[in-house]
Structures are given as structure tokens and as C-alpha cells.
């Protein structure tokens, strides 16, 4: 892996990340393909939208179809038909979202949400699975506490995250993939600082900010991000896990973050909402019924070049899956174009102006006509 910061504007930065399956320009948004697919979209759709990297989920793939099936195909890239870089998460976030966990320093024991069988996941198993998947970027196994956890619970999770990070690094025996460490610490400044110092002391290829944007106040999200970034090395990529709205991405880029992922754009598309350069657009609303406009006049995606708001409103109104497909394609295309403009504004020294304009647009309540 190679990472080079090419340009800065304040703390915002443009970089180039070279990975085994291709080059990724940062800041970058990564569409989420939980089960080795971005919902409703083909790899060709993603490529035409300009996606340079996607995220897939170790936890779900480990359970179904299982590592052996993916290994049979020659790895995750061939299994899902995607030739560009892939980042896999470690499974920690999903595991700690499940009820009735047994957690100790060895790992986590839980019931499979698929068939109820007992499953054990540890740093070593997570690394083994991710290496077998063959993703470009793997994530260390971490303990992500709930957003309402008290100080002592978060402190214990932070210490365990450090111990598990050491074991993840030790178990990561491959030269063809890279490993990112994850900083935890909840919403407690001293624990965020402590975790950042601990994780960076191990030495990873990149660093992720975990355990945020999971229900806490936005002001706390930004404060904890600032504290964390202060202790991360300048020459390594910084990844905010789970940040996906345009407004949040702008705030995080302004604080020095490089990489983002979220199901947000495709999830809201499936519920009839489009992201546009004028804000959110509700395609369920009746005012679209007679509109011959595209979803976004500034967008060049397949959806906007070929279909009207009226048609997509009709599809959504009738429950036709094509409406969800077309909006998913548009929203992913928008996010890729949005990140293009983020990078351009940093390169031109106009990022703060761009950020202010877009936050005003997205805080105004969205498009109504």
C-alpha cells in the first residue's frame, strides 16, 4: 500500500491510496455491499457510477455463504464480480449489535441470526476470514460499546480493543493485503485520546475512527473525531466508519478524515428519497406526479439521463422495484460526484465555501419543486 497526501485546505486533504486492486482517490465514499452486493445494483452499475472501492461485511459473509464457498471462487473479488479494491470490516460492530453475547478477552460467542447456532469470533478468526476473502483493506477486530454505555464499560471496551488490535496484527500473516486499526473510546475525550495513542503505537497501514455516528449527538461525533484525528499520523489514511450523509462527510473532511462508508444513500433510495445538488427530494410526494424534470438536472447518471421524476414517482407509488433500483443508482452516482467536487474544492482552496453552500442546501429541508 502507498498513501500520499497531494493537497490540503486547512485540515481537509486530497490523497491517493494505491491498493492491490487499484488506485483510490481520497476523500472517498465507499458504497456498502453487505452480502457481497450493493443492494439492487450490479458491479457494472457501480463502475459506471465511478465507484473506486466498495465495502463488504466479514460477519455476514462468514455466516452465509461461508468462507469455503468464497475461497472456491478464488476470493471475494471473483465471487462478486468486482475488480477494484474492497474493504472488509472485522465483524465487530455487527457482533456487538446482537443480543445475548458472551464476551471475554478470548473473543465473542453469539447465536447466529441465520440459524441460531453458536458462533465464536476472535481477532485470529476475523483475520483468518478476511485473509481468505482477499479484500484489499482488512480491519482489526475491535470491541464497539453501545452509544449509551457508561464510562467504566467504555473503558473496558477500549482496553480490550487495544489487546485485540495487538492480536489482530500478530495474526495478520499476509503481504498482499493491508490492515487498519480501529480507535474506540466512546464519547469520552480521555478514552478517545488513550485509544488513539494505543492503536497508533502498534503501527497499522491506516486508522479507523469507530464507535461514532451510532446515536450520539452530532456535536459529540465531531468533537470525538477532532480529538482522535489529533493523534493519528499524517501519512496514513483515516477512515470514519459509518459516516454517509453529505452534511456529515463535509464536517468530517474538514477535520482531516479521508474515507467514509454508509448504507445511507441506498437505504433512503429504497424509501423513495433522492440526494440532489439542491438537497433531498422525496419522490413519493404528489408534487412529482406531473414533473417532466429529471431527478437532478446537474446529474449525468443513467437515471437522470433517461427518466422523469413523474415516472419514478409512479414506480415508487406502485411499489415497483425498478423505482428503487433507479434511485439507488442515482444516489450512489450522486455520492461519487459529490466526492469529486469535495476533492476539487480542496485542490482549488475553496473547500470551506463549498462546505458552507452544501450544508445550507441540506439543512433547508430539501427540494419541493
From Swiss-Prot:
Cofactors that this protein relies on: Zn(2+)
Pfam families membership: TGT
One GO location term (cellular component): cytosol
Active site: 89, 261
Pathway in which the depicted protein is active: tRNA modification; tRNA-queuosine biosynthesis
Cofactor note text: Binds 1 zinc ion per subunit.
Molecular-function GO term, any one: metal ion binding
Binding site for Zn(2+): 299, 301, 304, 330
Cystine pairs: none
Catalytically driven reaction(s): 7-aminomethyl-7-carbaguanine + guanosine(34) in tRNA = 7-aminomethyl-7-carbaguanosine(34) in tRNA + guanine
Record text on subunit structure and interactions: Homodimer. Within each dimer, one monomer is responsible for RNA recognition and catalysis, while the other monomer binds to the replacement base PreQ1.
Protein's name according to its UniProt entry: Queuine tRNA-ribosyltransferase
Natural source organism: Thermotoga neapolitana (strain ATCC 49049 / DSM 4359 / NBRC 107923 / NS-E)
